[in-house]
Amino acid sequence: MDIALAIKALILGIVEGLTEFLPISSTGHLILAGQLLDFNDEKGKIFEIVIQFGAILAVCWEFRHKIIDVIKGLPNDPRQQRFALNVIVATIPAITLALIFGKAIKAHLFNPIVVASAFIIGGLVILWAEWRERHRGQTHDPRGNALLEAAKAGAPRVETLDDLRLSDAFKVGLAQCFALIPGTSRSGSTIIGGLLFGLSRKVATEFSFFLAIPVIFGATVYELYKERALLSTDDLSIFGIGFVAAFISAFFCVRWLLRFIASHDFRGFAWYRIVFGVIVLVTAYTHLIAWQA
């Protein structure tokens, strides 16, 4: 086994696992890391598909009890049927656009400059969304400028996954479409979209996790079938290293994020995106790093 290649696979697997479910864009990080590590050829693209599969399996394991309950309840449990329908409805917009524009997006937008720009814009959107969340529960006293807390106005409308309506799911699905632009972040689009549409932070995050399952599973199966001619048993060890690294790092990342959102917002991720995006743009325009267009 090529040790240098194995180390690259390990690093990229960890990058995928740590960034797939945070609002910072795994695709954007993989594009940048792949170029820095010189691991962005055709085999590298197949490798990215494999490690995404490892990351999504970590979510399936973390939420295995809920997934089993949904499967068991599909024949006769209206609550589980409604949840499954919500996931399906939220998945349709992004899949539809990906099938129509996927090739054009990969041909023209999968480059560091677009990624960096999306990092910055996405960070600004997160800051605005968090500002909106903090001020949603405040209103002005008509007799003066004093602010009064309006608990009812500030409380999220959707506090549990069972409260999620079909229209809510569809709106989150529309928000997910922005994630087709590399650097935007699928989890960031769905979580922030959920917050803007009245979901609590916990519900928006959990629904984003569940929404990732059909999206990433579907993309993995489709891409592996399409690129099956490039698959080789010689690559199994390298793919295996990346797969396991992505699974383990994603598993711990998902658990950490679920604890984190209980007492924190996403402003830290927003500033990270902005700073990282600026660094990429500066290094590109000053030629400190020869990013490929």
From Swiss-Prot:
<keyword id="KW-0472">Membrane</keyword>
<keyword id="KW-1133">Transmembrane helix</keyword>
<dbReference type="GO" id="GO:0005886">
    <property type="term" value="C:plasma membrane"/>
</dbReference>
<keyword id="KW-0046">Antibiotic resistance</keyword>
<keyword id="KW-0812">Transmembrane</keyword>
<keyword id="KW-1003">Cell membrane</keyword>
<feature type="transmembrane region" description="Helical">
    <location>
        <begin position="269"/>
        <end position="289"/>
    </location>
</feature>
<dbReference type="GO" id="GO:0071555">
    <property type="term" value="P:cell wall organization"/>
</dbReference>
<comment type="similarity">
    <text>Belongs to the UppP family.</text>
</comment>
<dbReference type="GO" id="GO:0050380">
    <property type="term" value="F:undecaprenyl-diphosphatase activity"/>
</dbReference>
<feature type="transmembrane region" description="Helical">
    <location>
        <begin position="85"/>
        <end position="105"/>
    </location>
</feature>
<dbReference type="GO" id="GO:0008360">
    <property type="term" value="P:regulation of cell shape"/>
</dbReference>
<feature type="transmembrane region" description="Helical">
    <location>
        <begin position="109"/>
        <end position="129"/>
    </location>
</feature>
<protein>
    <recommendedName>
        <fullName>Undecaprenyl-diphosphatase</fullName>
        <ecNumber>3.6.1.27</ecNumber>
    </recommendedName>
</protein>
<keyword id="KW-0133">Cell shape</keyword>
<dbReference type="GO" id="GO:0009252">
    <property type="term" value="P:peptidoglycan biosynthetic process"/>
</dbReference>
<keyword id="KW-0961">Cell wall biogenesis/degradation</keyword>
<dbReference type="InterPro" id="IPR003824">
    <property type="entry name" value="UppP"/>
</dbReference>
<keyword id="KW-0997">Cell inner membrane</keyword>
<feature type="transmembrane region" description="Helical">
    <location>
        <begin position="238"/>
        <end position="258"/>
    </location>
</feature>
<feature type="transmembrane region" description="Helical">
    <location>
        <begin position="203"/>
        <end position="223"/>
    </location>
</feature>
<dbReference type="GO" id="GO:0046677">
    <property type="term" value="P:response to antibiotic"/>
</dbReference>
<feature type="transmembrane region" description="Helical">
    <location>
        <begin position="3"/>
        <end position="23"/>
    </location>
</feature>
<comment type="function">
    <text>Catalyzes the dephosphorylation of undecaprenyl diphosphate (UPP). Confers resistance to bacitracin.</text>
</comment>
<feature type="transmembrane region" description="Helical">
    <location>
        <begin position="43"/>
        <end position="63"/>
    </location>
</feature>
<keyword id="KW-0573">Peptidoglycan synthesis</keyword>
<dbReference type="Pfam" id="PF02673">
    <property type="entry name" value="BacA"/>
</dbReference>
<keyword id="KW-0378">Hydrolase</keyword>
